[in-house]
């Protein structure tokens, strides 16, 4: 009898663990979808309001590797007026408080970062 109870308890624990895992996976997938949406909104804002010529997404959102509940959005831009950098960052952060957005000016990026951008980045 105790063997049957242990088996039922074990099955119950496994089912609960699987349910939690499924919820986490779904939650992460939904967060990733929201991050992509915000990245596209940020691209539109940067191009229309700040005259940015090109926007490339890099990092875990672009690669799909290592994206997690605290991942941010990494955008590289070409053609942003240096005097408007902080204003643009402020506007981007106001798009959605759930995400931090790192804005990298390609003109000031080190050469090794530019190689990564060209190899792994996604143009938006």
Give the location of each predicted region:
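Catalytic core of pol beta-like nucleotidyltransferases
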Residues: 1-53, 63-69, 80-124
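Glycine-rich beta-strand-to-loop/alpha-helix junction loops that act as flexible
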Residues: 57-60
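Short hydrophobic/aromatic beta-strand micro-patches
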Residues: 76-78
């Amino acid at each position: 009898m105790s063997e049957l109870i242990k088996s039922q308890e074990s099955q119950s624990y496994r089912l609960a663990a699987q349910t939690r895992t499924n919820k986490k996976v779904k939650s992460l997938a939904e967060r990733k979808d929201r991050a992509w949406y915000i990245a596209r909104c940020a691209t539109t804002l940067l191009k229309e309001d700040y005259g940015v010529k090109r926007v490339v997404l890099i990092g875990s959102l672009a690669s799909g590797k290592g994206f997690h509940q605290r991942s941010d959005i990494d955008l590289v831009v070409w053609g942003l007026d240096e005097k408007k950098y902080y204003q643009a960052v402020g506007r981007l952060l106001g798009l959605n408080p759930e995400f931090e957005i790192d804005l990298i000016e390609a003109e000031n990026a080190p050469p090794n970062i530019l190689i990564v951008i060209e190899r792994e980045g996604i143009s938006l």
